[in-house]
């Protein structure tokens, strides 16, 4: 394993140049193997987990979901506030910011972005909860691609460009995650579900953050500074891939759902009656995805 890690380090050094010495010795950053192993295990669980749960009752996970989503909401809020204040203190340039031009504020940004990297490991739990609750329809290509890639990308970011122009996407994403995980946390509480009408606007916000990130990253290409251009080109390409996948998700989830509901409504009127609707919601996920409710385990 040490030989493998040394070979990887040599390859990365030849490909990307020397690492940023400010993160030497930081947890999970010294070598790539732990991040790679976590990613492989994640993909194995995504593959094998639904097979294991196929003949088993889904878990409720309600209590732990409330705590989990509250924790990620607070962590995202902390990261957003720290990044905003760090950028202000370092007088960061919106158009392009090098990795060694912000003074003491750079170290503040680096510390917060390490938490951002680590949060991507924590967010693997999103998928594991889907598996335990047998919400396999939510384990999409977009979901797995986004979760698996972000952890790996941010390992490289933290080792080579841990501050400077790297701050912008993480700041926007932290803000979106405050909204997203607060929504998920509230949706775990049955009495709150009738008031959660703003789910699709979170997806719109995610698409907006990708567009804004491309615009801000492009500024660094048009008006370059000491921040490496290769990282900026990669960021733009990655954002385009996410926009493509998220746009497809939005169309599949909301536009087609609206067309389907209108057709059902027209069909009911043509038959001379309107379908009756239950006076209560038995399962939030069933309502959202038109899935028959399943009996859940209490553990």
UniProtKB/Swiss-Prot annotation:
Name positions with the PTM Phosphoserine: 285
Q: Name one Pfam family in it.
A: ELO
Listed under GO cellular component are: dendrite; dendritic tree; endoplasmic reticulum membrane; neuronal cell body
Ordered alphabetically, the record's keywords are:
Acetylation, Cell projection, Endoplasmic reticulum, Fatty acid biosynthesis, Fatty acid metabolism, Lipid biosynthesis, Lipid metabolism, Membrane, Phosphoprotein, Transferase, Transmembrane, Transmembrane helix
Bilayer topology annotation: Multi-pass membrane protein
Q: Look up the record and give one Gene Ontology term from the biological process aspect.
A: unsaturated fatty acid biosynthetic process
Name the predominant localization: endoplasmic reticulum
In terms of domain of life, where is this protein from?
A: Eukaryota
Q: Which pathway or pathways does this protein act in? A: Lipid metabolism; polyunsaturated fatty acid biosynthesis
The record's top EC class is transferase
Gene Ontology MF terms in the entry: fatty acid elongase activity
Q: Reaction catalysed?
A: a very-long-chain acyl-CoA + malonyl-CoA + H(+) = a very-long-chain 3-oxoacyl-CoA + CO2 + CoA; (6Z,9Z,12Z)-octadecatrienoyl-CoA + malonyl-CoA + H(+) = (8Z,11Z,14Z)-3-oxoeicosatrienoyl-CoA + CO2 + CoA; (9Z,12Z,15Z)-octadecatrienoyl-CoA + malonyl-CoA + H(+) = (11Z,14Z,17Z)-3-oxoeicosatrienoyl-CoA + CO2 + CoA; (9Z)-hexadecenoyl-CoA + malonyl-CoA + H(+) = 3-oxo-(11Z)-octadecenoyl-CoA + CO2 + CoA
> Where in or outside the cell?
Endoplasmic reticulum membrane; Cell projection, Dendrite
| Regions crossing the membrane | 26-46, 64-84, 112-132, 139-158, 168-187, 205-225, 226-246
- Give the EC number: 2.3.1.199
N-acetylmethionine PTM positions read 1
Function recorded in the entry: Catalyzes the first and rate-limiting reaction of the four reactions that constitute the long-chain fatty acids elongation cycle. This endoplasmic reticulum-bound enzymatic process allows the addition of 2 carbons to the chain of long- and very long-chain fatty acids (VLCFAs) per cycle. Condensing enzyme that acts specifically toward polyunsaturated acyl-CoA with the higher activity toward C18:3(n-6) acyl-CoA.
Q: How does it assemble?
A: Interacts with TECR.
Please report which protein family the annotation says this sequence is part of.
Belongs to the ELO family. ELOVL5 subfamily.
User: What's the protein name?
Assistant: Very long chain fatty acid elongase 5
């Amino acid at each position: 394993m040490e030989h493998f890690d040394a070979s990887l380090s040599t390859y990365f050094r030849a490909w990307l140049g020397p690492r940023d010495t400010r993160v030497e010795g930081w947890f999970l950053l010294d070598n790539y193997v732990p991040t790679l192993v976590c990613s492989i295990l994640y993909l194995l669980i995504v593959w094998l987990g639904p097979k294991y749960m196929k003949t088993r009752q889904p878990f409720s996970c309600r209590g732990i979901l409330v705590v989990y989503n509250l924790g990620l909401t607070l962590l995202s809020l902390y990261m957003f506030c720290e990044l905003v204040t760090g950028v202000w203190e370092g007088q960061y340039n919106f158009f392009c910011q090098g990795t060694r031009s912000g003074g003491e504020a750079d170290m503040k940004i680096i510390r917060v972005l390490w938490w951002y990297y680590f949060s991507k490991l924590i967010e693997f739990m999103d998928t594991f909860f889907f598996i335990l609750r047998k919400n396999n329809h939510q384990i999409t290509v977009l979901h797995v691609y986004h979760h698996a890639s972000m952890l790996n990308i941010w390992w490289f970011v933290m080792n080579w460009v841990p501050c400077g122009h790297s701050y912008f996407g993480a700041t926007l994403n932290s803000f979106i995650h405050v909204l997203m995980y607060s929504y998920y946390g509230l949706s775990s509480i049955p009495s709150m579900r009738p008031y959660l009408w703003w789910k699709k606007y979170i997806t719109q916000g995610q698409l907006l953050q990708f567009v804004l990130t491309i615009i801000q990253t492009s500024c660094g290409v048009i008006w370059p500074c000491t921040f490496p251009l290769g990282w900026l080109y990669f960021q733009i390409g990655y954002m385009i891939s996410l926009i493509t996948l998220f746009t497809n998700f939005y169309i599949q989830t909301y536009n087609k759902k609206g067309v389907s509901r209108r057709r059902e409504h027209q069909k009911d009127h043509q038959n001379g009656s309107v379908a009756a609707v239950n006076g209560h919601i038995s399962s939030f996920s069933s309502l959202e995805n038109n899935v028959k409710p399943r009996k859940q385990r209490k553990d």
